[in-house]
A protein has these predicted regions:
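Ligand-binding loop in jelly-roll beta-barrel domains
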Residues: 22, 39-40, 50-79, 151, ...
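Short, structured motif recognition centered on aromatic/hydrophobic residues
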Residues: 26-30, 45, 154-159, 174, ...
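Hydrophobic alpha-helical segments
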Residues: 211-213
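Residues at beta-strand starts and edge strands
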Residues: 1-2, 27, 61, 129-131, ...
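Alpha-helical scaffold repeats of the Armadillo/HEAT/TPR superfamily
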Residues: 216-218
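Conserved short histidine dyad/triad with adjacent acidic residue
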Residues: 1-20, 32-34, 38-42, 49, ...
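A short, N-terminal "cap"/entry segment at the start of jelly-roll beta-barrel domains
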Residues: 1, 75-129, 220-241
């Protein structure tokens, strides 16, 4: 599996039938792309299961997509039909137009720490109950409780500023967290929009006793050894004037 940002240049197109033989999940960060004459603009999402047929893809003016592949990328251009699990298809969801707060907070164990946010479930896998969802955090409504999960979790900050136990994250920041790693609490001085995914099964949450949250935490990212030097580079927040 892989998580990547894919940039499609203006005029990019594929006008033939093909099948991607792994799950592809994406969220549009910039621009617009059309698949099978369905237009995906900024802040739209899709989950296209393995074997989903694509007859055309085009990006007239270019697009940037946050993309998740469920396995090794394998594209089949043969005329042989491939089946796919229709229960795992999310053809298009617009974050702007969707009905938010469609998440079972009790099942996820997030009720105690979600008072300062609202959630939008984008996809729940019927095979293993992995979930992809958006969290919109309001300004100056920080959580108080550290937490951990029995499954891996990754998230990408789509907008705003998020302050947590490893420092400040802003738009474009990414985190991969293995199972059972204690993290948080988080809060935002500006409001933040975050896309999160659980990997390895259903998301549940263990809550720890309350601690003090800081909106100006020390910058101390946890990184693989080959990225340790990158973690020492400070990134200034955008100026207000």
């Amino acid at each position: 599996s892989s998580t990547c940002i894919i940039k499609y240049p203006p005029g990019w197109h594929r006008n033939f039938t093909e099948y991607v033989l792994t799950d592809e999940e994406f969220y549009v960060l910039e621009g617009e792309i059309s698949i099978n004459n369905i237009s995906y603009e900024v802040d739209t999402y899709a989950h296209l299961p393995s074997g989903f047929q694509r007859d055309s893809m085009i990006s007239k003016n270019g697009a940037v997509l946050l993309t998740f592949f469920g396995g090794t990328l394998n594209i089949n251009k043969s005329k042989e039909n491939h089946s796919y699990d229709k229960k795992r298809l999310v053809l298009k969801t617009s974050a702007k137009d969707a009905e938010w707060n469609n998440v079972d907070l009790d099942a996820l164990g997030l009720k105690e720490i979600s008072s300062g946010s609202r959630l939008l479930s984008l996809f729940v896998d019927p095979l293993n109950n992995e979930i992809t969802y958006l969290t919109g955090s309001v300004p100056f409504k920080a959580a108080q409780f550290p937490e951990r999960h029995p499954v891996a979790q990754e998230f990408y900050v789509l907008g705003g500023v998020l302050a947590g136990n490893c420092g400040i994250m802003q738009a474009g920041a990414y985190c991969w967290r293995p199972p059972m790693v204690v993290h948080g609490p988080y809060g935002s001085p500006t409001g933040a929009l975050i896309l999160l995914r659980s990997i390895g099964g259903p998301l549940t949450t263990e809550i720890f006793p309350a601690v003090e949250h800081s909106y100006q935490p020390e910058h101390k990212p946890v990184l693989p050894s080959n990225l340790s030097e990158v973690g020492k580079i400070g990134i200034d927040l955008p100026k207000r004037y």
